C-alpha cells in the first residue's frame, strides 16, 4: 500500500487545505491542488 503516496495526480481540484487534495498534492495559493 502507499505505492503512489509520493505522486500528485494531474487532477484540477479546488481546495482550501492540503488535506482536500489527493495523493501528495498540496493546496496552492490559486485555490487548486497541485
Curated annotation (Swiss-Prot):
The keyword Protein biosynthesis does not apply. There is a cross-link at residues 1-34 (Cyclopeptide (Ser-Gly)). GO terms for cellular component: extracellular region. Disulfide bonds join 8-25, 15-27, 21-33. It comes from the Eukaryota. It holds the Pfam family Squash. One of its GO terms (molecular function) is serine-type endopeptidase inhibitor activity. There is a cross-link at residues 4-5 (Isoaspartyl glycine isopeptide (Asp-Gly)). GO terms for biological process: defense response; negative regulation of serine-type endopeptidase activity. The record marks 10-11 as: Reactive bond. Coiled coil: none annotated. A cyclic succinimide probably forms by loss of water between Asp-4 and Gly-5, that can then rehydrate to either the original peptide bond or to a beta-aspartyl isopeptide bond. Three isoforms of MCoTI-II are detected, two with the parent molecular weight, corresponding to the unmodified and proposed isopeptide forms, and one with a molecular weight 18 Da lower, corresponding to a succinimide cross-linked form. This is a cyclic peptide. It is found in: Secreted. InterPro entries: Prot_inh_squash, Proteinase_amylase_inhib_sf. There is a cross-link at residues 4-5 ((2-aminosuccinimidyl)acetic acid (Asp-Gly)). Belongs to the protease inhibitor I7 (squash-type serine protease inhibitor) family. Inhibits trypsin; probably participates in a plant defense mechanism. The presence of a 'disulfide through disulfide knot' structurally defines this protein as a knottin. This is Trypsin inhibitor 2. It comes from Momordica cochinchinensis (Spiny bitter cucumber).
Amino acid at each position: 500500500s502507499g505505492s503512489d503516496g509520493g505522486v500528485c495526480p494531474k487532477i484540477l481540484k479546488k481546495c482550501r487545505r492540503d488535506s482536500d487534495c489527493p495523493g501528495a498534492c498540496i493546496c496552492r495559493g490559486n485555490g487548486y491542488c497541485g
